[in-house]
A protein has these predicted regions:
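Flavin (primarily FAD) cofactor-binding/catalytic cores of flavoenzymes
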Residues: 2-235
């Protein structure tokens, strides 16, 4: 690991609640930035159970403050050296490199990424809270879709719903984290249903006017005069 030590406290777990899920997107840009910048600085540990599944093995090792310097392929595996001069031979390597949320670095959307609004376009943090990683996040609409940087230039980008880690900065950790992903999926479905309905409003308006299936058929009651009555029940 590049880190010098394993983080031990999951700060966001400590404040996890339905209020956070519902309330985070409603916070100001300043507060959302402050929350996630603080969490980035504190760093997030691996789950305890996952860590124990590795450490219980005699050949499970944790190396801190070191990165891979060179990798060479051989017939039956790989040879790599670290920045501390260690040489290791392995069958394979799994690289946990994290996420890159910058639209300009995503091949699928790179051709039109210049017109996708990012956090750096909407918010400038105060001194000491700068974070290039946070600044590169897309700035989303409430339905997980992109926003245009220059409105009207590529309006179709707002029809791309990005339900993944890229939505974290704008809408919270609801698209890839176990405690809230079900909330996020339901949220996305509601937002898309609302959007489809509003786009088809002329059709629904016509259907409203054309609907003529009676709820009552006329034989469910008999018209009558209202009898005189008093509060003691006598009539």
């Amino acid at each position: 690991a590049r880190r010098d030590a394993m983080p031990q406290i999951n700060k966001m777990m400590g404040i996890g609640s339905p209020g956070l899920v519902a309330g985070f997107p409603a916070l100001s840009d300043e507060w959302r930035w402050r929350y996630l910048h603080y969490n980035n600085v504190a760093q997030t540990p691996a789950p305890r159970s996952s860590t124990l599944r590795v450490s219980r093995h005699a050949n499970g090792y944790f190396h801190f403050g070191v990165t891979i310097d060179q990798v060479k392929e051989k017939a039956d595996g790989l040879i790599f050296t670290t920045t501390k001069g260690r040489r290791l031979e392995t069958d394979f390597i799994i690289l946990g490199t994290g996420f890159d949320t910058d639209p300009h670095r995503q091949p699928v959307i790179e051709p039109y990424a210049d017109n996708i609004l990012q956090w750096r376009d909407r918010y400038t943090p105060p001194p000491g809270l700068e974070d290039e990683g946070l600044a590169s996040f897309p700035y989303f609409n409430s339905d997980f879709s992109f926003k245009e940087r220059n409105v009207g230039q590529t309006p179709w980008v707002e029809r791309i719903h990005c339900f993944n880690y890229g939505s974290k900065m704008s809408l919270g950790n609801v698209s890839g984290d176990i405690p809230a992903i079900s909330d996020g999926a339901a949220w996305l479905a509601r937002e898309m249903a609302a959007r489809f309905y509003s786009e088809d409003i002329e059709h629904h308006w016509q259907y409203l006017q054309d609907y003529d299936t009676p709820e009552l058929r006329g034989g469910e009651w008999t018209p009558s005069d209202l009898p005189n009555s008093t509060l003691d029940g006598e009539s």
